């Protein structure tokens, strides 16, 4: 294929699309390659809480990413909506955390990073049924509606002239003088200048195809998460709720997500009745009003997992034009 882009990105989930947007804004030409359709894997499947679960228990590197992204998400959503008329539904509905045995660590983290918090008022627990342990209210924590965010990002990039090469499997690469020159795909060869891999759970698998003997290959594995969607009425639940390792996320239209399972099943993203039953039990016990709301969707996605819980963001130490 001719017309070499300045930047070629493999993977067009949220990270790939957002990376492309930054390069477009800086004046570069960009091509995006995806093995399926843009934004249809883990990014689409996620709940959209704009905070890791219990960030004070996460490595410090995660906090730096969280704080920076929290500063920018509202403006990002507004910019995308103005440009595309597709609303990513950034929604600062707040997050109620029901159990915080490490409350001092939690509030210290919030103080350090200037995240507003309050002791949870009893009104926040209306309709909830759970044992409380130092509950914490984070009123400014927001969410985004992932499918709409992805749709808006893609529309923005298409209008900016970004090339999307979808349903395209990358099979191999040619390397000369410490640089990847060409990607070999099932749709033909694609020459590259700078190459960025944003393939999430599939990154280790792809890296082994491109660089089979690479000692720096990332250690990333898929982690399956299953989710449910309840067709509730608007204002049934007014804020996000985290109870132990599961959560409820109310959308603006009233629908409520319940998630998520954590399963190590390689690249199997099928759903199971067992996980559906567990999530249903969690959701309806925590918030009994959901017993009157039908479950309309049940899905699974594969997010990238690492042993340290820290994402890879770096240039390759030997391949000069490769980043992850």
PLM regions with names:
Residues 15, 38, 202:
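Conserved Rossmann-like nucleotide-cofactor binding loop
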Residues 18, 173-176, 185-297, 305:
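Flavin-dependent oxidoreductases
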Residues 24-45:
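Glycine-rich FAD pyrophosphate-binding loop
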Residues 137-186, 193-194, 198, 204-205:
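Helical element adjacent to the flavin cofactor pocket in flavoenzyme catalytic cores
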């Amino acid at each position: 294929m001719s017309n070499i882009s300045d930047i070629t990105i493999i993977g067009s989930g949220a990270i790939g699309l957002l990376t492309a947007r930054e390069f477009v804004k800086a004046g570069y030409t960009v091509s995006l390659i995806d093995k399926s359709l843009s934004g249809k894997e883990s990014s689409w499947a996620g709940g959209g809480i704009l905070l890791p679960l219990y960030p004070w228990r996460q490595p410090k590197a995660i906090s730096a990413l969280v704080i920076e992204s929290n500063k920018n998400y509202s403006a990002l959503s507004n910019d995308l909506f103005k440009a595309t008329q597709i609303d990513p539904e950034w929604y600062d509905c707040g997050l109620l955390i029901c159990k915080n045995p490490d409350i001092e660590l939690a509030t210290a983290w919030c103080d350090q990073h200037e995240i507003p918090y309050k002791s949870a008022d009893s009104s926040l627990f209306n309709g909830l049924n759970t044992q409380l342990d130092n509950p914490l209210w984070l009123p400014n924590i927001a969410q985004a509606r992932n499918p709409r965010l992805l749709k808006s990002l893609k529309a923005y990039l298409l209008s900016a002239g970004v090339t999307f090469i979808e349903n395209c499997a990358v099979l191999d690469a040619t390397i000369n003088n410490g640089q990847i020159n060409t990607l070999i795909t099932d749709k033909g060869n694609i020459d590259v200048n700078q190459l960025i891999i944003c393939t999430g759970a599939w990154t280790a698998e792809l890296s082994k195809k491109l660089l089979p003997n690479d000692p720096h290959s990332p250690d990333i594995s898929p982690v399956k998460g299953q989710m449910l969607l309840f067709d509730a009425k608007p204002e049934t639940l007014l804020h996000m709720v985290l109870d132990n390792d599961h959560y409820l996320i109310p959308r603006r239209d009233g629908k409520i997500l319940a998630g998520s399972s954590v399963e190590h099943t390689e690249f199997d993203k099928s759903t199971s009745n067992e996980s559906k039953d567990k999530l249903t039990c969690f959701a309806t016990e925590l918030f009994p009003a959901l017993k009157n709301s039908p479950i309309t969707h049940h899905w699974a996605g594969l997010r990238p997992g690492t042993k340290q819980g820290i994402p890879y963001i770096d240039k390759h130490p030997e391949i000069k034009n490769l980043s992850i």
